Amino acid sequence: MSKFWLLLLLVAAFQFAHSYPAAEYELDETTNDEVRQFIGDGYFEDEGDDGDEERFKIKPGKVLDKFGKIVGKVLKQLKKVSAVAKVAMKKGAALLKKMGVKISPLKCEEKTCKSCVIFKIPTENSFCLTIRFMKTNIATYLVVAGEINRKSKFEEKLKLGNMPRCVNVEGFIGKVCMKGIEGHAKSSSGQANVNFCLGLVAEKFGVGAKLCGIYANKKVRVKISPQLFPGATSLDGDIVKLDDNGEDATTLDVDEVEID
């Protein structure tokens, strides 16, 4: 069952539960702590200590509200893809499983980073990317230069948050789609920084990559290693990755991180 239908069933179940008054439950101390840790204290009404057990009411309205936000986020991430794209992603999954594609660590100096994707079939070829972070008063960009086997092929300026831009690259790799994704990172002192990723997919191989960095103190740092994934483009042109269930396609996001 896909995540979409599973979520619909869960929504229906919570709406059914929401139609009843707040229910009272008696939990032993261990279960009580586990439930509170998972959902949060704000979703309960304590009614005193009965000695060995604590009684409280679950607030279904708050639980449903929290669940609705989670469902909305997941549904927003789900994307429709063509049958051809789904086949390509499954092909990419098989290729990655056989270690036919690898990616090197992202190495950065000041505002510029570089990494290479190595394709080992049918013969070994390298697709290297140089990513330069550029921030202006208007917007934030990633200037991406691509080269195949040490030969320069393209340079694109990607605004963070925009839809992907695709280029037909000469050589073995073919069409490549790229997008800049923006998140946020806070330092331990609370200072706001830019947390970003470059997402790309080589449609011919059904393989994508996500390379992330943090811009802070006028230079880029790396906290998360580059990732490869089975990927394609959705019907609306976004970059998507194959979900763990092997059926759904989801958008790329930026992992929230905290820096020193």
UniProtKB/Swiss-Prot annotation:
Propeptide regions on this chain: 20-55
Subcellular location field: Secreted; Target cell membrane
Keyword Cell membrane recorded: no
Keyword Iron on entry: no
Assigned GO CC terms: extracellular region; membrane; other organism cell membrane
Lineage top rank: taxon: Eukaryota
Keywords associated with the record: Antibiotic, Antimicrobial, Cytolysis, Hemolysis, Ion transport, Membrane, Secreted, Signal, Target cell membrane, Target membrane, Transmembrane, Transport
GO biological process: cytolysis in another organism; defense response to bacterium; hemolysis in another organism; monoatomic ion transport; pore formation in membrane of another organism
Leader sequence residues: 1-19
Similarity section: Belongs to the redulysin-like family.
Functional description taken from the UniProt entry: Pore-forming protein that induces lysis of T.cruzi trypomastigotes, bacteria E.coli and human red blood cells. The parasite lysis is much more important than the hemolysis, probably due to difference in membrane composition. Its action on protozoan parasites and bacteria may indicate a role in the control of microorganism growth in the salivary glands.
Additional comment: Has an amphipathic alpha-helical structure with positive charges on one side and hydrophobic amino acids on the opposite side.
Protein name according to UniProt: Trialysin
Organism: Triatoma infestans
